[in-house]
Amino acid sequence: MLTRKQHQLLLYIDDHLRRTGYSPSFDEMKDALELRSKSGIHRLISALEERGFLRRHHHRARALEVLRLPHMGTEAPAATGTGTAFVPAVLNQGQTGLEGAFSEASVANDRQTVSIPLYGRIAAGLPIEAMQDDSDRIDVPVSLLGTGEHYALTVAGDSMIEAGILDGDIAIIRRRETAENGQIIVALIDEQEVTLKKLRRRGSMIALEAANRDYETRIFPAERVHIQGRLVALFRQY
């Protein structure tokens, strides 16, 4: 299991490679993780190498290679930290309740739940319309939601698998109209298509990034994209 800092650094390196084509500098990694010295970055990279997530090309500058990303719910820590990178809190939903994602003590504390609407399927591949139907609902632990209004959507497709978001997962969304770069959002395109993607602002344009190398980034004028909410957690049924 990766530590939170190891996981955060791995996602940061992977994102930087996707955006720029080369590795971030040690200073950039230090600043991104809010560490005081570069020695902490060296230790994190060594640990990621030992666990088979990262490879260093020692005779080249800024040459890190991401070999694999962790499978959420097994390698990744629960999402309670800060920063814009999404680390899913995956709750295994069984017939007897919620299991596996929290310790026994925290599950016991999460018996108090709130019912939120489940709005059909959202594409994690090509965008599709979301079904705005309040007839289906899902019970979610209150402590998982925090403040604000929430709703749920079922993920369809595989374009976000490298962020640990799988086909059939139930995405828990905090309703809001703004988000920071790097956050995973529900985006409404041209008032008719809805998709779950990572947000990147590029001047007057908005890029919607997949977390799967087989999918291209889609770029739109900002006025064509409206943010419908931000991903805060996942439910997964086995």
Swiss-Prot record:
It holds the Pfam family Peptidase_S24. The active site is at S159 (for autocatalytic cleavage activity), K197 (for autocatalytic cleavage activity). It catalyses: Hydrolysis of Ala-|-Gly bond in repressor LexA. The keyword Transcription regulation applies. It comes from the Bacteria. The record marks A124, G125 as: Cleavage. Belongs to the peptidase S24 family. GO terms for molecular function: DNA binding; serine-type endopeptidase activity. InterPro entries: LexA, LexA-like, LexA/Signal_pep-like_sf, LexA_DNA-bd_dom, LexA_repressor, Peptidase_S24_LexA, Peptidase_S24_S26A/B/C, WH-like_DNA-bd_sf. GO terms for biological process: DNA repair; DNA replication; negative regulation of DNA-templated transcription; proteolysis; SOS response. It is an enzyme of class 3 (hydrolase). Keywords: Autocatalytic cleavage, DNA damage, DNA repair, DNA replication, DNA-binding, Hydrolase, Repressor, SOS response, Transcription, Transcription regulation. Gene3D superfamilies: Umud Fragment, subunit A (2.10.109.10), Winged helix-like DNA-binding domain superfamily/Winged helix DNA-binding domain (1.10.10.10). Its EC number is 3.4.21.88. Represses a number of genes involved in the response to DNA damage (SOS response), including recA and lexA. In the presence of single-stranded DNA, RecA interacts with LexA causing an autocatalytic cleavage which disrupts the DNA-binding part of LexA, leading to derepression of the SOS regulon and eventually DNA repair. This is LexA repressor. Homodimer. Residues 26-46 bind DNA.
